[in-house]
Amino acid sequence: MLQISKLISQGAGLAPVLVKRASTLEIDWDVRQKSRFDALDSLGRQLGVFLPRGTLVRGGDVLIAEDGSMVRVIAAPQPVLRITACASHGSAFDLTRAAYHLGNRHVPIELKPDHLKIEPDHVLADMLRAMHLTVQEVSEAFEPEGGAYSAGGHGHTHAPAATPVPAAVPPAAHVHGPDCNHGHDHAHAPQAIKPVAIQIHPRKPHSH
């Protein structure tokens, strides 16, 4: 088994001619959302993919094998629901409402300017049709949004954020009021004694 532990997002920085010559790996979203899986490439090689946890593999990404060879990922067609606005009974804004309701249900969604795509679900399909949307069952590649905090399959790393250093705050003075009846569990530092200047006048002779 040929092991793979590196991914270059969309083949960034690689010569297009080399990417074109690379073997291919056609897999659907169910596999590509996993960071570890086994698969066969177009050359019949058994691949063991071990990527950092949370990595999403996208169509167009390039995997680098341990022997230095490249494998270009193709998003395989799969059954999906294609959702479009109904020109007769609705408006394009209905897609925005649909994306909102699907997002509240944490449904993976592929967003396009004129349509949405989700994995097959007859309950959601009925809900969307009730919202005056057109729902079609098709076989297409599925590339849902990865989320704002997803690793997203980036082929680079980000430097760690600097740790903020808290400003030193002097401790508040400890004042005992007349109603303060708690016991001392600490010592007070001795207060410095300020010198007091005493003026001495010469004594005048006493005359009778």
Swiss-Prot record:
One of its GO terms (biological process) is protein-containing complex assembly. It holds the Pfam family UreE_C. SMART domains: UreE_N. The keyword Calcium does not apply. InterPro entries: UreE, UreE_C_dom, UreE_N, UreE_N_sf. One of its GO terms (cellular component) is cytoplasm. Residues 145-165 are annotated as: Disordered. SUPFAM superfamilies: Urease metallochaperone UreE, C-terminal domain (SSF69737), Urease metallochaperone UreE, N-terminal domain (SSF69287). Belongs to the UreE family. This is Urease accessory protein UreE.
